[in-house]
Amino acid sequence: MAGGMKVAVSPAVGPGPWGSGVGGGGTVRLLLILSGCLVYGTAETDVNVVMLQESQVCEKRASQQFCYTNVLIPKWHDIWTRIQIRVNSSRLVRVTQVENEEKLKELEQFSIWNFFSSFLKEKLNDTYVNVGLYSTKTCLKVEIIEKDTKYSVIVIRRFDPKLFLVFLLGLMLFFCGDLLSRSQIFYYSTGMTVGIVASLLIIIFILSKFMPKKSPIYVILVGGWSFSLYLIQLVFKNLQEIWRCYWQYLLSYVLTVGFMSFAVCYKYGPLENERSINLLTWTLQLMGLCFMYSGIQIPHIALAIIIIALCTKNLEHPIQWLYITCRKVCKGAEKPVPPRLLTEEEYRIQGEVETRKALEELREFCNSPDCSAWKTVSRIQSPKRFADFVEGSSHLTPNEVSVHEQEYGLGSIIAQDEIYEEASSEEEDSYSRCPAITQNNFLT
């Protein structure tokens, strides 16, 4: 190790102050070994660090320490951008992520915790280390397990479609949570998915119901829960390999457990209690907010979108309110425009359309069960004419149509104009005779 101290131990010659003979030499040897271990654990360690650059591949064949410095300030368009350090090797390697060079020096120093944690760390030949957009520096240590291992390290900054899909899923759960909680398709599909993914957790939960209280078996059950979660994580990481090698067993498991989950969901049925539906709705909306926050890499933009979503969901149509308010303000600032008057032709057409519509509504009401036929017939003078009207005949007789044409038709309009002109001429003649009569009166 770099910076370590090698201690050479020579046999003792003759008796010393720490003892005599063989016993004294053993004591001195033990103290020297312990002091050497102490110096090895506390000595300053010089770490050879390779600085990584984006999109530049660094290839190594030995254990090495790497650091990446993020100098770019995140912008609003980086909400779905992810920075990752990819380590791809020909054989299994162990990757340890730390914050800075000081932590790398601590990894090089001997400690009981580092010794045991090295056995617990997962060994992979292709791994990704996520780097935060606001993280200034990220360091990692790559340790090879076998000789002749070749690996490459590269920093990737790219648009991550997974983040975008997680954000869309959060939007859907938040705005459609009330609809999904009442949907039978969502109920059965969610039940089957939970049954397939968490079958071990469900089995452990069922077994815990049959265990007596204050039993030491609960310790085993807690360990079973942790082991089940670890197995689920391991299966998802190696899902492609499992499908390629054991697709028959995986397909049989999915079909069997899926059918059993569907049977259990069918037995209990969808939620019917309104309070249970509300609880499921709130749970889905809370999950949607969490997905929305985790799907955006910039925290303050994520919080702003969550606040907008809450306002849009809880306030009744705030955009429509804002539009109506702006419209009223603009109308108040402008001068009122007088309404446009209808022409004679438009007035006639509108009257015919509205009359025809009102007559059709009257026929529908008379044919409906709400209309009392006997009471209606007893109040009208011509029941047969009313019956013909209800069956689709005209509401006017030919005589009434001719009278209407004479009064309001084209000929009647001309006659009215002539009468108006005659009346106006008579008024003018009477006005012209009035001054002469007045003058004669004064003369007499």
From Swiss-Prot:
**Which segments carry the region annotation A?**
186-297
Is Transmembrane one of the keywords?
yes
Transmembrane residue ranges: 161-181, 186-206, 216-236, 245-265, 289-309
Example GO BP? nuclear membrane organization
Q: Does the keyword DNA-binding apply?
A: no
At which residues is Phosphoserine found? 368, 424-425
Q: Name one Pfam family in it.
A: NEMP
A cellular component annotation (GO) from this entry: nuclear inner membrane
Membrane topology type, per the record?
Multi-pass membrane protein
The entry's free-text remark on domains says: The transmembrane domains are required and sufficient for its oligomerization.
What is the protein name for this chain? Nuclear envelope integral membrane protein 1
**Lineage, opening ranks:** Eukaryota, Metazoa, Chordata, Craniata, Vertebrata
This protein's encoding gene = NEMP1
